[in-house]
Amino acid sequence: MKHLLKLQDLDKNEILDILNLADQLKYENHNGIEHHHLKGKTLGMIFQKRSTRTRVSFETGMYQLGGQALFLSNRDLQIGRGEPVQDTARVLSRYLDGIMIRTFEQKEVEDLAEYGSIPIINGLTDYCHPCQVLADLMTIREYKKSFDGLKFCFIGDGNNMANSLIVGAITMGMECAIACPNDYQPDSEIMKWANENGKFTCSDDILACAENADIVYTDVWASMGQEEEKAEREKVFKDFQINDKVMGVAKNDAMVLHCLPAHREEEITAKVFEEHANEIFDEAENRLHAQKAVLVKLLAD
């Protein structure tokens, strides 16, 4: 494992290795056991999209691992003034031990990896969000103990989260059902791959997708950069909500996950959110532990 650019780059055993290490790091963290695996290491964090969870979890993670993190916005980088990504990659590779980037274009992440000489971590692009899904898988395993025989249901926009969740669910052997409007489906190549490699469905039939689900997941209707589409999206997605009706067809012990931030009474009702708040905030915490595992895998000597 040289980089984390997208979840498709990892096989089942590699994901399990990360989850096992994340579990260990979480246990040590909760029990006051220091683990300075990255003493003397520096992570550069490039943010072209704002974030709460990504910045805080990576910065805290590097500190807990004995290293340090540098926050770099567009205003701090010549890349924001037209410097080619390949030049930025080669320069930062001389100063840093790794780069985490949260940006719009997947190509920018791929270019950093191609032209740089240090590990690159995809903190989010419009195409995928591998770090979040590693935390999701960690949380599912904590609650369900195993991925065997589980049905995973996602309700909402077929966006970067849906793309990575499909890959994560199918890779780990879960059945995966996506409920979304027909014009907002996930990436066609990812859906083709999912059909070839597991049990996968995508339709606008919300209740059929949620039927007998072990995990029900959602995300905001309008992601960052889609603010001008918000009113239109609210009309299109108004029925694509996790509510009592949806939970009524899922399994009795179904868990609910949300990558946050949540817009109550839009993609999820306040009632369902609060009933499953422990799961959702365990999931949020697990961003820290899953990403620390990725950092150790990539940056430790």
Can you name each region flagged by the protein language model?
Residues 48-60, 142-218:
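Glycine-rich phosphate/diphosphate-binding loop of Rossmann-like nucleotide-binding domains
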Residues 1-56, 60:
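Positively charged, low-complexity intrinsically disordered leader regions
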Residues 42-43, 47-95:
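Active-site cofactor/substrate anionic-group-binding motifs, chiefly glycine-
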Residues 253-254, 260-301:
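Adenosine-phosphate binding glycine-rich loop
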Residues 97-168, 258:
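Anion-binding alpha/beta catalytic cores of soluble intermediary-metabolism enzymes, centered on
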Residues 65, 95, 115-116, 172, ...:
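Short, structured coil segments at secondary-structure junctions
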Residues 195-271:
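Rossmann-like adenosine-cofactor binding region
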